[in-house]
């Protein structure tokens, strides 16, 4: 027996026939999806050409079958659907790679959606049946049409014209299909089985499309309100409205449904309407037409697309056969007023408004009750920008047309050439739609974005000038007079340095150059916002063109904050202190600095590196809030590193600041944002600290040791100013804040624990940064070890020796091993542990750490640092284990 082949019924009038048709179309679409752009464009052009040539017979068919509209206008619609749509998209890429940027590693690839279900309205049957298949062909989709029962013949005929031309040009057979005997059940089936729905029709049909469970591109009802402002060109306005409202007897959904005219020009507007052949209904006639517009609360289908005279006759009114529009002068914009509804015919409501605001209020109500999201129009002198902006702000419509006939203007590319041509006009969320623009080819493709991994642009930012060497301060300051010609200098320092004559060399040099100066020396060890504000107030009175901040990190930080407040008195520290993941992508834009004053930083200790960093910390003593500011606008313009200013630093300061330098360099080297530039600075700083910190600690008068430690501090500062720090500093910041330990000591107490933590080859989470490809911190630490002469069989062995060498360094400078040894009360430490941990996790430094921390892991580091490695009490371990579960 011969095998029975599946056949597709020639007439689609049953669910079974439709199922077979859809299956065949999906197979055709799979073939079509492989076509090149050149093949598609050939098909697109052939189909558009055929539709254009058939525009007149198709227009005749539409009027004959539906009994609506005007043949000549439908010819224009068909012509528009073919020619304008082709012209708009002939050069648009819709196949394969449509966009590529090799520099940024982005490629966009267009793919067809599949099978489109197209619901076609009775008002624009042939033009819509040209438009939708054309954009489907351009996007390599199959399209199956569900025609309106009252327009099925002409709709199918239009689709056939497009299909036959497409197939002849190489398209797969059956790429366009239709239901021959349309019904609600078959339409629902089409919508369920298609991949996307293009729904144009009444509110019920559009709602069904959105309720089908498939993506839908539908439109909402139009109730276009027009306002004629008293500045408008009356002849232009009236004749544009007539031109639009009479086009195809008002069946374009964007056509005007009401016109609101300002009282001052109402009479002239009315006269122009009359002169151009419109008819104003008398009071008794108004009531008759009202009863004709709506039947049982719904639009009377019999008036749709009919001539004005025909509608008048239906209402029992006699008007000239040449009457263009029936105009009803009404007052209410409420839905109880029949004239306030969409009428899809040459029937127009006309309102009078005393003011422009009243006109807008009427238009708003008309849109809200019947045309949310669709179209509105305004006739006005375009120099009236304020009125135009007010109108645009008030109208919840996706098309706001200025001095434009709304039927022809709304569909696009006729009166504005950036509004894309379409016969499916999206109304946005206001109209219950998924799109708020004219639907086109971009809505019928899926775009795949291929994103190649790219690494961030990195940078090296330093002060414009860095001067260093013992005794260089007065020489560097020469530039203020000889090069920059500064006139007034403001010095910022603390009281100890001022009273002990540290600023005298600066003051003497300024006097020698004839530069007027003053000194603010009330900076506290933990600089406060109050003292910074006081300093800034003094600056504003003195009006310096140069600021010199001299001291440790506190004085330099305070100087930076005063600089900000001096140049930007309204600076918001809450915003400036916002955390960031990438300093170049932060939400807050720092104010540009340097407009009023040049900033010079002069360190008196070897530790913070603040003279070359874009960081500052300020505390609001009234609230206890610390604001850590970070932005390259805070980078000093000049740094002067003169060892003469550091020779008398006591042992405690030398120890704490020296180990801070080591921590800066270690964290900068391990940071995810480390680069070849910062690596060199960090490694050299580490070598110098190992070699010279013990000497500087043992003998403060050792000039060579002091000089090298000053250089190490500055280089480590440059390194972490660009590579940033990590959780070592996050933990130390909070340890110091909660338990009042010197910052450098706090860093030292967690240092070895953090290094072990970061060196894990299998971390719970690695940090996120494109340059950081995989956990390799152990190898980085081993590189540091080898750079200072350590050897071993593997990275782990070298790392262990590095830890040992660091411990020996800290022992040499007499840093204790645990937090507990510094007298921090155990009970209070444990009470603050959770809060400390959370704040450390949220610290700005955490983001660049190579291992992204869990809070439980940070807590464990704190406990190890308090009790010592391996000395955490068993009771505490059990408690932590229980809380972690």
Describe each PLM feature range.
Residues 267, 612-723:
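Carboxylate- and glycine-rich phosphate/diphosphate-binding segment that chelates Mg2+/Mn2+
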Residues 738, 745-831, 871-872, 876:
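Gly/Pro-rich interdomain helix-loop hinge
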Residues 3, 33, 317-456:
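Conserved C-terminal structural/oligomerization subdomain of aldehyde/semialdehyde dehydrogenase
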Residues 2-107, 135, 275:
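N-terminal Rossmann-like NAD(P)+-binding subdomain of aldehyde/semialdehyde dehydrogenases
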Residues 93, 158, 530-644:
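Glycine/threonine-rich beta-strand-loop-alpha-helix active-site module
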Residues 97-236:
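Rossmann-like NAD(P) dinucleotide-binding subdomain of oxidoreductase/dehydrogenase enzymes
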Residues 5, 12-14, 130, 206-334, ...:
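ALDH superfamily catalytic-core signature
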Residues 457-546, 819-820:
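ATP/NTP phosphate-donor binding region
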